[in-house]
């Protein structure tokens, strides 16, 4: 059995990269607190992890589109007397289409999930970690943080925020004993694109997708090594590097071409 005091909290922990990260923590004998919207998916994931790795898995079904969601998760974990040694902010969504045709209410929800929840969880748990001089935080950002994303303008913007925000906070706590790591995946084979109505984008429909297990491994190893940031995948590293040296308008044009819909209709659907 895992050490009763060694817990990792993972948002978006029932699927995709978050689920693969949960497996890696469990292999290293971390107990888990998994947060997602679907109780059914959480229960299935928890049962599999408990059976395979013999760890304790607590699940919290919570809608992190709601600003109070992270606070409620924090209070519930605290009420159970659980100390979080590792925080993984992974839950996130996007929306595909030209900004003039996308749904503003959906975008405001995405901003709350991709930024609000990250900032809240980071604030609440970083304060505890700094006070005890130990802890690790993994922020799942995106390659999109490094480059503008036509047809995903809000999503890329939220990820640029997360990377910039994390780099600033990391500097503030650099001598505290707490490490904060950024994981920037590229296109990964998860349900993200279905939720974003993005399956018709050329980069998704015709391009290759990374295995979420490989992405999770890159992030987990970087987290445990105390690294600042990892871009997962060689070609993504190349694209991130080019994004930092080429003119912004050229990068935006290249990304626009990659994200074009196969049906030619860029409007949100």
Residue ranges and their predicted role:
Residues 122, 158:
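Active-site helix of classical SDR
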Residues 172-235, 245, 249, 253:
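SDR active-site lid
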Residues 28-44:
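Conserved glycine-rich Rossmann-like NAD(P)H-binding loop of the short-chain dehydrogenase/reductase
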Residues 98-100, 106-111:
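Substrate-binding pocket helix/loop in short-chain dehydrogenase/reductase
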Residues 90-95:
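Conserved NAD(P)H cofactor-binding loop of Rossmann-fold oxidoreductase domains
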Residues 142:
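Residue(s) in the substrate-gating loop at a strand-loop-helix junction
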Residues 12-16:
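Conserved glycine-rich cofactor-binding loop
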